[in-house]
Amino acid sequence: MATQEAGKLEWRISVDNGTTERLVPRSGLSKRIFLWLKDLVMKVIMERVAKFMRKAWRIGADDPAKVVHCLKVGLALSLVSIFYYMRPLYDGVGGNAMWAIMTVVVVFESNVGATFCKCVNRVVATILAGSLGIAVHWVATQSGKAEVFVIGCSVFLFAFAATYSRFVPSFKARFDYGAMIFILTFSLVSVGGYRVDKLVELAQQRVSTIAIGTSICIIITVFFCPIWAGSQLHRLIERNLEKLADSLDGCVAEYFKENEVSTNRNEDENTNMKLQGFKCVLNSKGTEEAMPLIRFSGFSFSQANLARWEPAHGSFNFRHPWKLYVKIGAAMRRCAYCLENLSICINYETEAPDQVKNHFGEACMKLSSASSKILRELADMMKNTRKSSKMDFLVFDMNSAVQELQETLKNVPIETNKPEEVPSEEENKVDSEERTTSMSLHEVLPVATLVSLLIENAARIQTAVEAVDELANLADFEQDSKKKTGDNNTKQPPLSS
């Protein structure tokens, strides 16, 4: 039965209970394919969104400082935008409140040092370039028809000088961003002043908006959950010293351990992580010195340079010797290169005879233990910012272990006992004595390489000790007043002549 309802024709059928049901036509093949594709696309999109949200949550959970930085940026922008919303404040800066917002976006960084660096560079460069631009504009207006020539020559000369200064390493390390802002501001003021009547008033308004933006950034980054670049660098040095000690102990212990199959998977993973600890020290060079830690507009600043911009905080004074952290990091990386070669010795295809391993094992383990104790003591000095009262004894123990290992190296066994199998009892009775065979060079070479690397690593650790001692003296670390007890107290370090 067909009925017409609201201009549409529909078909109904009668069922057993006396009612009718509407017949719905089956969807075509193209429509079913469209619905299937729609569901597939929505499923893929939802999976991607869920994956992105999980990744974003994991990043924030691993490093809450990133979340804090985002909140601080939002707070700074909210405060500076008041100058744009409120008419009295907006008129007070001559309608240029947007420059304050742009300043916050550009200069706000993840730690105090980077924010201070960019704020000071931006303010000083803007004031200096604006003043020079106004002076050049005045000179150009007094020159009559040569106005365009004067402006063009001044732009060329100042742009050349500022750009060339960015290639000077000492200048680039601290004022690279300021040089770029100087070029930009000077060009805008000097060239733009050719078509602007109230140039001085415009320059004053721009400077005031930049001052407002940088002031808000400095206040928020210092007084609201501050993240100090100096503290981050200090903790990085401390952690790397601990990782070097663990890696040194792990490499030597792994080489001299007996060949046993371990059944504890978690223990193997933990041991492998300690063995690879030296890689963290090698990769941290970018954070300490050379590789870009914070990038903006193509520029990079090292962690030590950023720390120099920060005010006094915690146990760090205003003129804290941050340059020495780069020196300490370089000394640690030299130790890490030795450990990298030590880890290669573990994977040598040529196995040294057990007799040779037993000959060197005790002396190598003793030197490894003495060296790792020094590294851990250095880490403890950095952690507590205190001078060590037992460092001289630990260095004396390490030097004694080096001498002992060198003496052991002079008495390398050149022959090894190898009993030969005999085919018959008669031959066994005739020749029952063990025969000696000489060892080849490639059998002794792995252990000799290990020994030389341990001795070289001890010398490099001595360099790290000197660098940390220099830092402790210049930074006025407190003297360790705790009375040290143990076996080391009975020993006396060698007297210096």
Swiss-Prot record:
It is a multi-pass membrane protein. GO terms for biological process: malate transport; monoatomic ion transmembrane transport. It comes from the Eukaryota. Keywords: Ion channel, Ion transport, Membrane, Transmembrane, Transmembrane helix, Transport. Residues 413-437, 476-497 are annotated as: Disordered. GO terms for cellular component: plant-type vacuole membrane. This is Aluminum-activated malate transporter 10. Malate transporter. It is found in: Membrane. Its main location: membrane. Residues 417-436 have a biased composition (Basic and acidic residues). Residues 487-497 have a biased composition (Polar residues). Belongs to the aromatic acid exporter (TC 2.A.85) family. InterPro entries: ALMT. The gene is ALMT10. The chain crosses the membrane at residues 66-86, 88-108, 123-143, 148-168, 173-193, 210-230. Pfam families: ALMT (PF11744).
